[in-house]
Amino acid sequence: MAQNRFHSGTGPSQRQLRVGELIRRTLSDVLLRGDVHDPELNRHSITVGEVRTSPDLKVATAYVLPLGGHDAEEALAALRRNAGELRHLVAKAMTLKYAPQLRFVLDETFDRMDDTRRLLSEDRVRRDVESHPEDDED
């Protein structure tokens, strides 16, 4: 029986990573060119930060964020509404056995980085780090 490597704690396979990156690039190109027949979607500049695929490569989750972070929910709704057309356009540009079902999620990476940066710049954290220097002896 095949293992579900994505959820076993070992992370995605090389094939999942490769296909995810190919889908990310293709989806970015499709959105940049404005190939979708929805003016509401085409008025947004959307960044596709990452695409994660399921182990069987039949589902691809795209982590997206409109440039500037404005109207994120509106852009996400437009992507979800046009998921079928986007799937068709991505499949046409790729040579996979199955066209993956596309799911769209807001990319919160930048928000988490800002939170981490803000936390590390707090005085009490800085004092704590300075009072406990790491041992560099190996």
Swiss-Prot record:
Presence of keyword Cytoplasm: yes
Q: Which GO terms describe its cellular component?
A: cytosol
- What family, per the record? Belongs to the RbfA family.
The record's GO molecular-function terms, alphabetically, read: ribosomal small subunit binding
- The identity of this protein, by name, is Ribosome-binding factor A
SUPFAM superfamilies annotated for this entry?
Ribosome-binding factor A, RbfA
What NCBIfam families does UniProt report for this protein, alphabetically? PRK00521.2-5, rbfA
Q: Which HAMAP family does this one have?
A: RbfA
PROSITE patterns (UniProt xref):
RBFA
As recorded in UniProt, coiled-coil segments are none
Instruction: Quote the function comment for this protein.
Output: One of several proteins that assist in the late maturation steps of the functional core of the 30S ribosomal subunit. Associates with free 30S ribosomal subunits (but not with 30S subunits that are part of 70S ribosomes or polysomes). Required for efficient processing of 16S rRNA. May interact with the 5'-terminal helix region of 16S rRNA.
Q: Offer one Pfam family short name for this entry.
A: RBFA
**Superkingdom of source:** Bacteria
Task: Specify whether Cytoplasm is a keyword of the entry.
Answer: yes
Q: Which organism is it from?
A: Paracoccus denitrificans (strain Pd 1222)
